[in-house]
């Protein structure tokens, strides 16, 4: 039967990653470069090699990266949850406020909206232009309303129009005055390596939100998210987030109560299979050839 669900790779695409399942067997020495036995507990923020790999996708420093399990949506939900329950960097927990609002560029990702809806957060639609969200609307809303705490962004090849945010839009998001000191950009760069063409001249380029925020004097404004869901296997990949050193320290302090660590064997499997940024690009070219 025909499956009309959007966002699911075809069988031929899934088959590309089947050799990854042969990389680790009962005879494999499951240790990282530091010599840590990955079969055991530990390494809250992910093995170093996986942090380096995911940092190449997230365009960030490995020191600012945390590697999780298979789902970036899970990370985003937990990130909203931490802001809701604990607040971020000493700010008032969102749950204690009379009202919390989020900006939602439309068309956008329904699962993003499902997260904010689950917390009772009021969602404000923002029109999308060919270069990203309408920044005149965004800037007015965030400047005048302290209850606007965040914005959902799929900044590259976003569905359904394939929009990539322009440099100007990225810089405006990073630098715009906000009434809320704890305003956060939820930067879901889900399609960062999903180019259709090999020639760099034919690929969209996205300005790094972290660099833009640092340059604008708002280094804690962004949370970046990504995963290998549409790179290797959607149900069995690895995911990661990147943020400022302050935010990462805050997140790890909360995470340390929630978990001892994620699936390090799968992190090792992905490192051995994809290797590095060049390996990811080579693998994604195979996806593009199928499409």
Where are these regions (language model features)?
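Short acidic, S/G/P-rich loop/turn micro-motifs used as interaction or catalytic elements
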Residues: 10-13, 157-160, 232
């Amino acid at each position: 039967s025909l499956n009309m669900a959007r966002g699911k790779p075809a069988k031929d695409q899934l088959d590309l990653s089947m050799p990854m399942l042969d990389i680790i067997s009962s005879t494999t020495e499951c240790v990282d470069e530091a010599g840590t036995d990955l079969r055991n507990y530990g390494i809250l923020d992910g093995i170093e090699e996986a942090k380096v790999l995911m940092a190449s996708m997230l365009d960030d420093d490995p020191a600012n990266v945390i590697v999780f399990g298979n789902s970036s949506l899970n990370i985003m939900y937990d990130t909203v949850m931490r802001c809701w329950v604990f607040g971020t960097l000493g700010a008032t927990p969102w749950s204690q406020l009379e009202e919390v609002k989020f900006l939602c560029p439309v068309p956008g990702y329904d699962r993003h909206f499902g997260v904010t809806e689950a917390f009772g957060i009021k969602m404000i639609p923002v029109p999308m232009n060919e270069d990203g969200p309408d920044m005149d609307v965004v800037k007015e809303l965030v400047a005048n309303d302290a209850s606007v705490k965040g914005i959902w962004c799929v900044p590259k090849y976003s569905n359904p129009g394939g929009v990539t945010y322009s440099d100007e839009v990225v810089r405006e998001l990073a630098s715009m005055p906000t009434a809320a000191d704890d305003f956060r950009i939820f930067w879901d760069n889900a399609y960062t390596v999903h180019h259709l063409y090999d020639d760099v001249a034919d690929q969209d380029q996205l300005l790094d939100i972290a660099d833009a925020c640092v340059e604008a004097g708002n280094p804690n404004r962004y949370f970046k998210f990504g995963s290998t869901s549409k790179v290797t296997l959607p149900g069995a990949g690895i995911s990661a987030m990147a943020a400022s050193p302050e935010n990462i320290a805050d997140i790890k302090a909360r995470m340390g109560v929630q978990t001892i660590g994620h699936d390090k064997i799968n992190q090792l499997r992905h490192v051995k299979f994809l290797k590095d940024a060049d390996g990811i690009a080579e693998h994604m070219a195979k996806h593009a050839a199928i499409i």
